[in-house]
Amino acid sequence: METMPNWLMQRAFLTPDRTAIEIEEEKVTFMQLHEKVVSVCGNLTHVGVKRGQKVAVLMKNGMEMITVIHALSYVGAVAVLLNTRLSREELLWQMDDAEVICLVTDQDFEAKDIPVYSFAEVMNGPKEEAFIQEEFSLEEAMTIIYTSGTTGKPKGVILTYGNHWASAVGSSLNLGLRDDDCWLACMPMFHVGGLSLLMKNIMYGMRILLVPKYDADFIHKALQTRGVTIISVVSKMLTDLLERLGAETYPSSLRCMLLGGGPAPKPLLETCVEKGIPVYQTYGMTETSSQICTLSADYMLTKVGSAGKPLFQCQLRIEKDGVVVPAFTEGEIVVKGPNVTGGYFNREDATRETIQNGWLHTGDLGYLDEEGFLYVLDRRSDLIISGGENIYPAQIEEVLLSHPAVAEAGVVGMTDDKWGQVPAAFVVKSGEVTEEEILHFCEEKLAKYKVPKKACFLEELPRNASKKLLRRELRQLVEEM
């Protein structure tokens, strides 16, 4: 069993006085962070958290969430990170599915069968001497993060200490490391992209400027004045920043904008080139512990639309009907590497279907060019990406079909200037119901960003001979609106 020293403990020993986290004007060193974490471990032990148990974390970006995530690793518990934008029903379902023993949160939340603790309670409540892991086993689970499948039912992706370690190492081999590096973190830490920065923070000994909530004005100013060298963004954020930048440019110390959430429009990249902003486009998912492919800034314009090549220790190929296909042939993107999950929690069938001989079948379609650059054609063909959030139509359809006046339902994405895409619903009625009633019903069952922005009524939904829903025809209807 391969082990490593406890990451934060080792970092606090190596560089105790180096700044770990900055939030607004507050600075916390690695040793101070370690001491906060040890204090929380005492309370987690007091309330009965033991090694191997799962603890749900429902918190917004902040020092508190960072402390709790590290404290759970110190006592050997698995952090189940919950999306703060989900509805109460969705959160309860995920906690039940993950078999968590309690919830730590910074929000008002009540659960009948699960003890709920505020951060104030775990920080300042009664304490017992905790057994702290001084070593991590790379095979052990560290986190579970839920991701929706094409069936719409969320699956808990198990990421081990080894997965997170490999992801951070792969990123450093790709982007390089500098003593003065500072990564501005504005992605939610309940997503793997945000969480991965916490791993890099303690492994690299790199300062993080943490933004509790997305604020384009604050981020723009921080890039100009706070010595930020790297930032992770999605296209909408990049557009927001360029609007604020105007005719100016950012300091040359900003060496990387890591762009995820799908390919960026060419005019956006051309503007970045003109202003000397190095954009690195990436491709990844929860199952790969964040990025697995990156297009360096050198190829921003010559390989427009490409997600680049795999990280150093990763492999990628395109398959069609189980056979590896040549360049420029469309097929399923299949990846392999030490950062790839070993499977889904309590989903043996889904794990066997998705991971075969170590290769992860992403469900995404794409092709490689003659030089091995990846082009992603469709992120799980039915997926709607709204403001960087993944929305699966099947989950919304399931809610719609639970309405007594809905006989059939189909959901697709429609273009939106602000969010990129938003859901649009098509419904066949079985009784009297209005569009307003349908949307209100969804608001009670779904996270706000998943609620359809429009509900249209049809006599029947387009289907093929096998009665499978033809989403492409629904997309055509959306385009004709």
From Swiss-Prot:
Pathway(s) of this molecule? Quinol/quinone metabolism; 1,4-dihydroxy-2-naphthoate biosynthesis; 1,4-dihydroxy-2-naphthoate from chorismate: step 5/7; Quinol/quinone metabolism; menaquinone biosynthesis
List, alphabetically, the InterPro entries matched. Answer: AMP-bd_C (IPR025110), AMP-bd_C_sf (IPR045851), AMP-binding_CS (IPR020845), AMP-dep_synth/lig_dom (IPR000873), ANL_N_sf (IPR042099), MenE (IPR010192)
Does the keyword ATP-binding feature in the UniProt annotation? yes
Question: Molecular function terms in GO for this entry?
Answer: ATP binding; o-succinylbenzoate-CoA ligase activity
Q: What class of enzyme is it?
A: ligase
The EC number(s) given in the record are 6.2.1.26
Q: Does the keyword Transit peptide apply?
A: no
The UniProt keyword set, sorted, is: ATP-binding, Ligase, Menaquinone biosynthesis, Nucleotide-binding
> Which reactions is this enzyme annotated as catalysing?
2-succinylbenzoate + ATP + CoA = 2-succinylbenzoyl-CoA + AMP + diphosphate
What job does this protein perform? Converts 2-succinylbenzoate (OSB) to 2-succinylbenzoyl-CoA (OSB-CoA).
- Annotated family: Belongs to the ATP-dependent AMP-binding enzyme family. MenE subfamily.
Name of the protein this chain belongs to? 2-succinylbenzoate--CoA ligase
Organism of derivation: Bacillus cereus (strain Q1)
Q: Gene for this protein?
A: menE
